[in-house]
Regions:
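A conserved short beta-strand
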Residues: 166-178, 198
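Alpha/beta-hydrolase fold nucleophile elbow
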Residues: 139-150, 171
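The feature captures the conserved acid-bearing segment of alpha/beta-hydrolase catalytic domains
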Residues: 179-246
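Conserved acidic catalytic loop of the alpha/beta-hydrolase fold
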Residues: 124-142
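Active-site machinery of serine-nucleophile hydrolases
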Residues: 56-123
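Structural cue for short, hydrophobic secondary-structure segments
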Residues: 49-51, 82
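A domain-start/cap signature at the N-terminus of enzymes
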Residues: 1-45, 79
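Short glycine-enriched nucleophile-adjacent loop
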Residues: 154-165
């Protein structure tokens, strides 16, 4: 007897996806979402995952296991949302560079403006369009949101923290590209931060040995450590973690467990 397997595309349990074209950025986004636990009266807390095409599957699988209270066995309620692109790649380098980088200086050449500097537009997409879409389907708590970002995604997280810190309550940022444009993001570093915001910064041990010309060897790790200290002096709830044996590519996966366990502690009821 011959067997002819009927191969089909794999699916993620509990996950759904759609696409949305933003009027603010002009780009089309692949949105993956999964609602876990019983929805609270005030709506689901939300974890936004930047580079969602790369990280949503891993974070969802970990959250399904690690967001469970070990005593009550109840699942911390949350909506996990991956923000990606529709081009079919793990990372769309050109689109993420536009979305995740802060505004360029006024004298920046037009060639750079075509590649970078649209973080404000991307923020309006999240605030005005994506949040409304999610709320209409799931009902969300817009006062209790978190963001996970890596590299340029973490740079976007820092820019949001510095300019509109109330946009998210929890910032989970790994290997932030503070070096970009001669550390331009630090131009927005505030004098104070609101109470009640949690910041978790991380980097891989081997990122401190980076020899790329656009990232000095002292950049990724040392600058993240220095920034954590600065934010601490501003009164922020901040913690920096250095992941042994991790490099820029795998550091976010080392950090995922810490990020999910942090959210379990703040979101568990």
């Amino acid at each position: 007897m011959s067997i002819r397997p009927n191969w089909q595309a794999a699916t993620l349990l509990q996950a759904e996806e759609t696409s949305i074209t933003s009027a603010h950025t002009g780009r089309t986004y692949r949105i993956q979402a999964a609602a876990l636990g019983e929805r609270p009266a005030g709506g689901y807390p939300v974890l936004y995952i930047l580079d969602g095409d790369a990280f949503f599957p891993a974070i969802l699988n970990m959250a399904q296991s690690l967001l469970i209270n070990p005593i009550t066995k109840s699942h911390a309620a949350c909506l996990i949302v991956g923000i990606g692109y529709t081009g079919g790649t793990i990372r769309d380098l050109s689109q993420r560079a536009l979305d995740y980088t802060p505004p360029l200086p006024d004298n920046a050449p037009e060639s750079e403006r075509k590649q970078y500097g649209q973080a404000d537009r991307f923020s309006r997409f999240i605030n005005d369009e994506l949040s409304a879409l999610l709320d209409s389907k799931y009902r969300i708590d817009t006062q209790n949101q978190a963001v996970f970002g890596h590299s340029f995604g973490a740079l976007y997280g820092l820019y949001s923290l510095f300019t509109r810190p109330e946009r998210f309550r929890h910032y989970l940022l790994v290997s932030p590209s503070i070096w970009w444009q001669d550390r331009r993001v630090l131009d927005w570093l505030p004098d104070t931060l609101p109470q009640g915001i949690g910041i978790r910064l991380g980097a891989g041990e081997h990122e401190g040995r980076n020899n790329r010309p656009d990232q000095t060897s002292s950049g990724m790790v040392a600058q993240a450590k220095i920034l954590a200290g600065t934010l601490h002096h501003l009164g922020a709830d901040v913690r920096f973690t250095l992941y042994p044996n991790a490099n820029h590519g795998n550091a976010p996966f080392y950090a995922l467990t810490d990020c999910i366990e942090y959210l379990r502690n703040v979101w568990q009821r």
